[in-house]
Amino acid sequence: APALALSGRLGDTPIVLRSAAVGFAWPGSLAARNVDVALGQPDAPNRFTIASLTGQLGTNLSGQFSGAEARLDAVPLDLVDASGTWNYTGGILSLGEGAFRLLDRVADDRFRPLVARDASLTLADNRIAALAVLREPSSDRIVTEAKIAHDLDSARGHADLLVADLLFDDRLQPDTLTYLALGVIANAEGRVSGTGRIDWTGDAVTSTGRFTTDKFNFAAAFGPVDGVSGTVEFTDLLGLVTAPDQRLKIASINPGIEVYDGELSFQLEPDGLLVVNGAEWPFIDGELHLLPTRMKLGAAEQRRFTLKVVGADAAQFVQQLEMSNMAARGVFDGELPLVFDEDGGRIEGGLLTARAPGGNLSYIGALTYKDMGAMANFAFQSLRSLDFKGMTIGLDGELDGEIFTRLRIDGVTQGEGAKRNFVTRQVARLPIRFNINIRAPFQRLLHSFRSLYDPTYVRDPRDLGLVDSNGRPIAAPTIPAPLPPDIQPPDSRKVP
């Protein structure tokens, strides 16, 4: 037949079937192209299109299909490129050896395609029951097992989802499952387990889920994050919406100085909006807070984070930076605003301020070089301990480039342990302010603090041939003048 147009019932289920060219014999073979099937009530049909349908017609009806697509009206997920076997016996339609791709129907896909093989489906008594194991295609890793039940009469159904110890590593990353993770999470390592459920009627779809990790590591824009643990509850799993105030423990985070044992509060809202309610960590006898912020997942936009330092102890800070020959006393508060965009990350207007009544900076190690000279050694011993009444530290610049650090130290006097003499006693009567500007790459800046005070951290310039054994600079070697060329240069004079 050149074409086919049928309507009726498959068991108790209304069915409308149309196709292009069809060839069949009874008993015998069936071959059909471009088959369009609508199952269920006319106002909310479940549609199936099949590019190729073949089979054997007799006591049992069976065959193969390929190039099929399936769409449940109430569920915003579509099956494409489906193939497998079919069998109709005793009023029961069975599909087996099913392979397909699962796509998000939303225009801006929330989920990347998943694939299945060896899926199965039965239609009996007007009810569909299906089982499929869904995999991420590039890694072939199982993401979830789905068990589906659907009543064609009521257009109601549900899908139970099981995620069993899903491993994220160099083969599978969050952004290979959803584009919303791009620019938010990278280099993920860890396992996630949980369950989800999707329920639908002819009018609405609801979906929920709970997913847990015991240890999840990843790289974020503001630094590496290790040991994330906890459970996240979704109130709209398909829409990636969570219940308010989801909390995760964070073993450590390193925005430049590593901090430990924190907790993050957040929620995911409709349209891919991540709301960070805040996070906090113990920080060198004080606290480090991530202030509330909002960002659109999957969008190329400027993102701002602010780290707030409360009651940071200067002595602990020096230890964190491994300044083995430096000691400090004082308490600091401040904020470090971080901005991330397509040009990278930077600090804008970072400021740390010492609390009253001030503090102390002191050098507690031996001099790096023993031959600095009598006056230099005398001055160093006199100023090796400084008390201050006020200190501010300003920070600006690119996180992957140069950071400008401005130190302003007010009310400077000699501290305990410094040698006093006539000069220092006269200086002590004067109001002194130190203004120090440091310009260096951010990561190198942290190392520079240590190299200033730890003689084992940098190489001796005498070993590099920059100074002699007495500390005097070594003159640069004299470069001899070039020898006359072996070949006479051309003579360009005019000759008669």
What are these regions, as identified by a protein language model?
Residues 332-333:
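Short, solvent-exposed loop/turn segments enriched in Ser/Thr/Gly
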Residues 1-195, 207, 214, 218-325, ...:
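Interface amphipathic segments
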Residues 347-367:
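Short helix-loop boundary/capping segments
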